[in-house]
Swiss-Prot record:
Catalytic activity: uridine(55) in tRNA = pseudouridine(55) in tRNA
Family: Belongs to the pseudouridine synthase TruB family. Type 1 subfamily.
Annotated GO MF terms: RNA binding; tRNA pseudouridine(55) synthase activity
Alphabetical list of InterPro entries matching this protein: PsdUridine_synth_cat_dom_sf, PsdUridine_synth_N, PUA-like_sf, PUA_sf, tRNA_psdUridine_synth_fam2_C, tRNA_psdUridine_synth_TruB, TruB_C
The protein's name: tRNA pseudouridine synthase B
Length: 297
């Protein structure tokens, strides 16, 4: 007899350093005994912190988290530029940054805050004509990724110190999805004409999920448990619309409801607490965006 499929939902992982996001997925596939595992929002190997992983039908919910805001704690080293904009790459230039004026640094940080155009780092997972940018760079190709709009809502300096010819900044960043913290380090260094790169990165938040929700990967391998079932995931991520049990049955079958003047996506929740679906008004219909509990009978 085949083992029953694991329950669907999300696992909030505290990713360790030295491992790709795909490595985490591979280990959780083994731990949960299912191929249906995926992640939202890639973390670089050197980065640690919040990685949201979907299990079973939870993988389909991940597509509705792509636009989530994110928060990071990071360390930026001014005085050296690298090929990858982080400590994993080769140093390509150095300039003594020990004499930088702190007020000048803060002024340039202001210029990198708000709605900005950011050129993603070349060594990234962005696809160019079907091939990831980091693969093209590895194969010796010249890569030029166009700048794209991102929002940096918080870029605060928590601490700073001079280390020889380098000027290190401990920073906290809140930003839109698609923002590269490595690129912020690079651009800050370029603006100050000394070069810059990232030496540490820890993601502290993805949408509504924080480090308080996260479990170390090693513990999940020993005891594979969901962090949130689908009902909890939907209601943590979206405002709730209370519906009747009958309406829940209709939505579970892909039917639509009469419009109610809603703005944006809501989680439709029955009196029994089941988050049946994500719904959104489209014209004269209140239609499903994602069905968490489909009724295929």
């Amino acid at each position: 007899m085949n083992a029953p499929a694991p329950k669907p939902g999300l696992v909030i992982v505290d990713k360790p350093a030295g491992m790709t996001s795909h490595d985490v997925v591979s280990k959780l596939r083994r731990a949960f005994s299912t191929r249906k595992v995926g992640h939202a929002g890639t973390l670089d190997p050197m980065a640690t912190g919040v990685l949201v992983v979907g299990i079973e039908r939870g993988t389909r919910f991940l597509a509705h988290m792509v636009a989530s805001t994110k928060a990071y704690d990071a360390t930026i080293r001014l005085g050296a530029a690298t090929s990858t904009d982080d400590a994993e790459g080769e140093v390509i230039s150095t300039t003594d940054a020990s004499g930088l004026d702190h007020s000048t640094i803060l002024a340039e940080i202001v210029n990198l805050t708000g709605d900005i155009m950011q050129k993603p780092t070349k060594v990234s997972a962005i696809k160019i004509d079907g091939k990831r940018a980091h693969e093209r760079v590895r194969d010796g190709e010249e890569v030029d990724i166009p700048a794209r709009p991102v929002t940096v809502s918080v870029f605060d300096v928590l601490d700073y110190h001079v280390d020889g010819e380098f000027y290190d900044l401990d920073v906290r960043v809140h930003c839109s999805s698609g923002t590269y913290i490595r690129a912020l380090a690079r651009d800050l260094g370029n603006a100050l004409q000394v070069g810059g790169h990232l030496t540490a990165l820890r993601r502290t938040e993805v949408g509504p999920f924080t480090l308080n929700d996260a479990t170390p990967l090693s513990k999940l391998q020993e005891n594979p448990e969901l962090s949130l079932n689908l009902d909890q995931a939907l209601t943590r991520s979206y405002p709730v619309l209370d519906i009747t049990e009958d309406e829940g049955v209709d939505l579970s079958m892909g039917k639509w409801l009469e419009p109610r003047g809603l703005k944006g996506v809501h989680a439709a929740v029955t009196p029994s607490g089941k988050a049946v679906a994500l719904i959104e008004e489209k014209g004269k219909r209140l239609a499903t965006v994602f069905v968490a509990h489909p009724n295929t009978l």
